[in-house]
């Protein structure tokens, strides 16, 4: 005899992508609760138009974050966590980038934001629109790390693009340029 919980309790390994020519990509978008239906309507247009291979969606409630600079919840939000499959090719990556940017624009148009980041697909303009305290965050980062010891691709794309990141002619070295 089996209980319903036993029958419905499959391990996550059954969802694991075992195809060498594709990969699964998580996206997460945060939208004010009152606009979730409009956001879903926009996604119903965008995803098929961009031929997105959506595998799964999880919805969760997010409380307001008043503590962090890069907050994704400026008020109560609903988050859509979406799992997409994409080809591991330059074309697959370009398609996912285009899809992502359109979904970010849809979230932004409703006062929402995107999660930071699973992929660096957001333009610097989209990033700064979604995270208005980013400039202050990057200023603090440079204040506490003036030599640029701690860097990653996120910082190189969005922090160096930030106004004032080239202060006094100082450009932080990319990791490959630094001697150890």
Language-model regions, residue ranges each:
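Substrate-recognition/cap regions that form aromatic- and gly/pro-loop-enriched pockets
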Residues: 2-130
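Activity-critical C-terminal alpha-helical subdomain
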Residues: 13-14, 108-180
């Amino acid at each position: 005899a089996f209980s319903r919980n036993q029958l419905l309790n499959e391990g996550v390994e059954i969802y694991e992508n075992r195809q060498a020519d594709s990969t699964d990509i998580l996206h997460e978008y945060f939208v004010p609760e009152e606009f979730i239906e409009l956001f879903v309507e926009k996604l119903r247009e965008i995803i098929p138009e961009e031929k997105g291979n959506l595998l799964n969606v999880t919805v969760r409630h997010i409380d307001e974050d008043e503590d962090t600079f890069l907050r994704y919840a400026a008020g109560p939000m609903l988050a859509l966590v979406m799992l997409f499959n994409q080809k591991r090719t330059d074309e697959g990556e370009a398609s996912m980038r285009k899809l992502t940017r359109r979904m970010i624009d849809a979230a932004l148009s409703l006062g929402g934001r995107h999660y930071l980041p699973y992929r660096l697909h957001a333009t610097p303009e989209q990033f700064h629109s979604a995270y208005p305290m980013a400039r202050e965050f990057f200023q603090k980062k440079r204040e506490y790390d003036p030599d640029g010891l701690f860097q990653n691709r996120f910082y190189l794309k969005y922090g160096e693009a930030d106004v004032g990141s080239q202060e006094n002619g100082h450009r932080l070295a990319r990791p490959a340029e630094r001697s150890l």
